[in-house]
């Protein structure tokens, strides 16, 4: 099976490495020639996964046509905010009925669309068969062969079962479900809560506060998800609770790092410019806040993070507001 992987960041590279290790014919499409050279010559991604050895069968290219030629599966791992433009530019090269799997986590800020909705809109007429893979999975640990469990959402149960087998290895266990919307929203909203958790940790608020944020963040995730047609039970799984816990507590979490740096007094623009990788939660906060207002969903943590990130509010003031809201039943 030939698989075209779009996006040579840490997660795209990790999944390409995983699939190449299974014997799949994988082509990794990357815009940076230095990354292409590193993957093909040194079997390393020098920009995003420096020091980690990649499978020698993995090949990278800057040529989208080369990556897509004869591909059975398109695995999209480009940043969410770039997904629409990438799909639009590649559409003439895509065949009808192609399997498109997203491993990106976020919501488009302009149109408030999930990746699945963007695929449906941009590839209309090509009848793409869509799936999304998500869950608690730091890229470096996947490349290192550490045990990882994720979930693959696909409305077509049979296709979901096939893709589950494609992605599974002895160290990368893939479950499947049919709630595509729930899997996508869990992977997006958890990044907003992770920034809040990092901010809380950085301000020295302790373990109690972090646990409270994770738990109430899960409630917000489910509240918005159900309003948008997802199943509440999905958020108790790997793409919801699992990814939320990892992203709020793990030191490799980019979104948690944003919160920590905000707490240290750094400005948001400087943080984003200095990270070298995309922290999806910054843009996703804006999108989730807008979705909540549109759907009439009460998301107080998201509202507070929007005020901090986009209105310049003092984090300590927002914590005070969260803690002194009207009391209610859980």
Swiss-Prot record:
SUPFAM superfamilies reported in the protein's UniProt record: 6-phosphogluconate dehydrogenase C-terminal domain-like (SSF48179), NAD(P)-binding Rossmann-fold domains (SSF51735)
GO biological process: carbohydrate metabolic process; glycerol-3-phosphate biosynthetic process; glycerol-3-phosphate catabolic process; glycerophospholipid metabolic process; phospholipid biosynthetic process
Annotated NADPH binding sites: 10-11, 31, 105, 139, 254, 278, 280
Pathway: Membrane lipid metabolism; glycerophospholipid metabolism
Compartmental location: Cytoplasm
InterPro entries: 6-PGluconate_DH-like_C_sf, 6PGD_dom2, G3P_DH_NAD-dep, G3P_DH_NAD-dep_C, G3P_DH_NAD-dep_N, NAD(P)-bd_dom_sf
Protein residues bound to sn-glycerol 3-phosphate: 105, 135, 137, 190, 243, 253-255
Protein name (database record): Glycerol-3-phosphate dehydrogenase [NAD(P)+]
Organism: Nitratidesulfovibrio vulgaris (strain DP4)
Organism lineage string: Bacteria, Pseudomonadati, Thermodesulfobacteriota, Desulfovibrionia, Desulfovibrionales
